Amino acid sequence: FFGRVDFIYEGEDEPEIFYIGIGNFAEKAGHIPLVYDWRAPVSGLFYDYDKGPASYEAPMGEIHGEVASKWQYKIRNGKMIYEFESDVKIDDDILKAELGSNGEVQLKNIIRTIQKEQNAIIRNTKDRILVIQGAAGSGKTSVALHRIAYLLYHDRQNLKSSNILILSPNGVFSDYISHILPELGEENIQEMSFDLFAYRKLQDTAADCEDRCDQIEREMRDPCLLYTSPSPRD
């Protein structure tokens, strides 16, 4: 686990403690939850609230109460790296360390550092079409992948990994993100470039599709083409 929320239900005096982790973990005998998946409804308390009034959506309706305290942990190889009570938000130094540098070979999962605004996007189940805009390095890809993991968790009966396709710019990008969903306990999903996707959809039509390599060679032969808008081809 990496987080903990002490939550006092409305009308109660003593808090119930919820530990938040990468997946659900329960007692073998009584099936009593010991750790809750970061995507579980109650885990939203960890990402959305500081100390004070709070609520979360449960199958039986909205649950109201108060966050008494919130803790963050990092445990590696059975050793506690850090442990602290957070009554504001994730500390900037911790956030920077978790996100790593821009030179990372592979993208990191962000379940320890998801911010309130990101969590709202990840857990949005009302909008069928969702556009995420932001500058380079702002976390769009991370949020999108964690949203996929959330949707697969939230609607397992109707949504499978095989129903989802990522259009990636190239193979390097595909390798960069390929480990995230397995890390989050989900099967990997299909990824392909838009060129390949278009080719597969159009290969049986009468259209003559120019592949990317041919396009680059043509433009290199005539540099003027790089600065003019493409015209319709027969």
Regions found by a protein language model. Give the residues of each.
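N-terminal pre-Walker A segment at the start of P-loop NTPase domains
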Residues: 102-115
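Hydrophobic anchor at the beta1->P-loop junction of P-loop NTPases
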Residues: 132
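The conserved Walker
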Residues: 136
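Conserved glycine(s) of the Walker
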Residues: 139
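N-terminal accessory nucleic-acid engagement/regulatory domains that precede
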Residues: 1-97
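Hydrophobic positions on the alpha1 helix immediately C-terminal to the Walker A/P-loop
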Residues: 143
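Pre-Walker A adenine-sensing motif
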Residues: 115-123
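Alpha-helical nucleic-acid-binding subdomain
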Residues: 152-229, 233
